[in-house]
Curated annotation (Swiss-Prot):
Similarity comment: family membership: Belongs to the thymidylate kinase family.
Enzyme Commission code: 2.7.4.9
Matches recorded under PANTHER family: THYMIDYLATE KINASE, UMP-CMP KINASE 2, MITOCHONDRIAL
Name of the protein in question: Thymidylate kinase
Role noted for this protein: Phosphorylation of dTMP to form dTDP in both de novo and salvage pathways of dTTP synthesis.
Length: 212
């Protein structure tokens, strides 16, 4: 597959939506087609990115980390990820499967933190220079159900400790973004796992068919 141009597939959604499971499923489906893949996550995916992740997610920084600082840290991590991991992999013909990307910032910082979307978009244009995923799957889940699932994983991190109203704002913003960007594929993640996986498989198989 090295002779082919790689693709970037992003999995988005609230906590507890099943993003990690979806990433693994996408990798399996691509592997069946002999497509070389790598996985990554946001924030993180590089040495610097993981350091920034530890700051952003650390509960010790509750009420300490300014929203603007958080936003800048996220973009710093994203730049490192794009330049050090994603672009090199795509240039080698690999398909990159990412747990979160730009849409998360718009939803969490723009929606959850109520930050000015114009500022975020300007920062995005400066940092990403138009770089976009080839496919985004948004796993849509009720915030209450998502947090119940997330809680079963263990202790909450700094973001997961936010109020349920915070996650409802994110959820609402995701829906607005999906309506504004019809290329984003929304999948109902409130359903049983096998139904969610079946929907993901259908989307991925169609995407593969049109890109091989």
């Amino acid at each position: 597959m090295s002779s082919l141009t790689g693709k970037l597939i992003v999995i988005e959604g609230l906590e507890g939506a099943g993003k990690s499971t979806a990433v693994n499923l996408v990798v399996e489906l691509l592997s069946q087609k002999k497509i070389s893949t790598i996985t990554t996550r946001e924030p993180g995916g590089t040495r610097i990115g993981e350091i920034l992740r530890s700051i952003i997610k650390n509960p010790e920084y509750n009420n300490v980390l300014d929203d603007r600082s958080e936003l800048l840290l996220l973009y710093a991590a994203r730049i490192q990820l794009i330049e050090q991991v994603i672009k090199p992999a795509l240039n080698e013909g690999q398909w990159v499967i990412a747990d979160r990307f730009e849409l998360s910032t718009l939803a969490y910082q723009g929606g959850g933190r109520k930050m000015d979307m114009r500022v975020i978009n300007e920062l995005s244009n400066f940092c990403l220079k138009g770089f976009k995923p080839d496919l985004t799957l948004y796993l849509d889940i009720n915030p209450e159900l998502g947090m119940i699932r997330a809680k079963s994983r263990g202790k909450f991190d700094r973001i997961e400790q936010e109020s349920i109203e915070f996650f409802h704002r994110i959820h609402d913003t995701y829906h607005i973004l999906v309506k504004q960007n019809p290329e984003i594929m929304m999948i109902d993640a409130n359903r049983p796992l096998e139904d969610v996986q079946s929907s993901i498989q259908s989307v991925i198989e169609e995407f593969i068919e049109h890109n091989l």
